[in-house]
A protein has these predicted regions:
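Terminal, intrinsically disordered low-complexity segments enriched in charged/polar
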Residues: 47-64, 73-78, 86-89
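Short, ordered coil/turn segments that flank beta-strands lining enzyme active or ligand-binding pockets
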Residues: 14, 127, 160
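A short beta-strand-loop-beta hairpin characteristic of the jelly-roll/cupin
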Residues: 110-144
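Conserved short histidine dyad/triad with adjacent acidic residue
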Residues: 26, 75-118, 151-155
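N-terminal leader/capping segments at the start of a protein or of a new domain
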Residues: 1-58
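Ligand-binding loop in jelly-roll beta-barrel domains
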Residues: 69-73, 80-82, 132, 139-144, ...
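Short, charge-rich binding segments
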Residues: 64-69, 115-116
Length: 165
């Protein structure tokens, strides 16, 4: 089980001064695929440019993999080691269905059951541990501090260690 993610949200008071609106562990944690992946939603925007006034919670819905049209999602994902995550009884169809992403699943790629494609951009930062980023052609090992800019590609993630990433 991952440690709670502290989420601090700022905003404005009635006089337009900057203030802290909340400072607490994120309440929006979702377990996908028998708990093999834990997703912590931190913030969501629903337009661009983002609406920065008001104090409403933006992560107030059921988990889904895609952001709203013209919006963005900031999340932290923890991957268990592959042998735990995709061990006996792993059902990738069910895992992607739980994320509302069965349409993104690449059923034709035999290299890894996690291959999927969306037309979104992802900024992937490894905070702890290590994980392989797999593309249709090639793979690279990412370690803590590494950043990957994923531009509408067909990725899969492989944690070949014995610790979560």
């Amino acid at each position: 089980m991952p440690k709670p993610i502290r989420r601090i949200v700022t905003g404005h008071n009635a006089e337009g001064k900057s203030v802290f609106l909340s400072d607490e562990p994120s309440r929006f944690e979702f377990n996908v695929g028998r708990g093999a992946v834990t997703v912590t939603e931190l913030w969501e925007t629903r337009s661009s440019p983002a609406e920065n006034f008001g104090s409403e919670e933006t992560v107030d819905h059921q988990f889904g993999i895609l952001p709203p049209k013209d919006g963005s999602i900031f999340r932290i994902i923890e991957y268990l080691p592959d042998r735990q995550r995709m061990g006996e009884g792993y059902d990738r169809e069910a895992a992607f269905r739980a994320m509302g992403a069965e349409h993104a699943l690449d059923r034709a790629n035999p290299r890894h059951p996690g291959f999927h494609k969306t037309d979104t951009i992802h900024y992937v930062i490894v905070l702890e541990g290590e994980i392989y980023a797999l593309m249709d052609e090639g793979e690279t090992l990412m370690k803590a501090g590494d950043v990957l800019i994923q531009r509408g590609t067909n990725p899969a993630w492989s944690n070949r260690t014995d610790k979560p990433c």
